[in-house]
Amino acid sequence: MQFVLSWVFLVAILKGVQCEVQLVESRGVLVQPGGSLRLSCAASGFTVSSNEMSWVRQAPGKGLEWVSSISGGSTYYADSRKGRFTISRDNSKNTLHLQMNSLRAEDTAVYYCKK
């Protein structure tokens, strides 16, 4: 049985009451349970390595849920993602990644990368 894993990459910088969107990308992917997927979020207008960066997700009909963060040399994960998900940065490409392994049906969600 397959399930749909969708994500939206969204990196925003607040400027007063305005929000400048630096990147928006949407895509839907069919992934087999137990499969793997790597998300990438390329940022512009700021340096990924100088900021705390996070992934959050929203499952169908539910609120936003924190997935993982990276700050300096430290990484943080929600308990249910430890050992399955790995957050990382590519400073040379100013890009944030989320490697997701051993995917489950309950991982079906819209994924957001955020500053």
UniProtKB/Swiss-Prot annotation:
Residues 53-69 are annotated as: Framework-2. Residues 1-19 form the signal peptide. GO terms for molecular function: antigen binding. Residues 70-75 are annotated as: Complementarity-determining-2. One of its GO terms (biological process) is immunoglobulin mediated immune response. Its main location: secreted. This is Probable non-functional immunoglobulin heavy variable 3-38-3. The lineage of its organism: Eukaryota, Metazoa, Chordata, Craniata, Vertebrata.
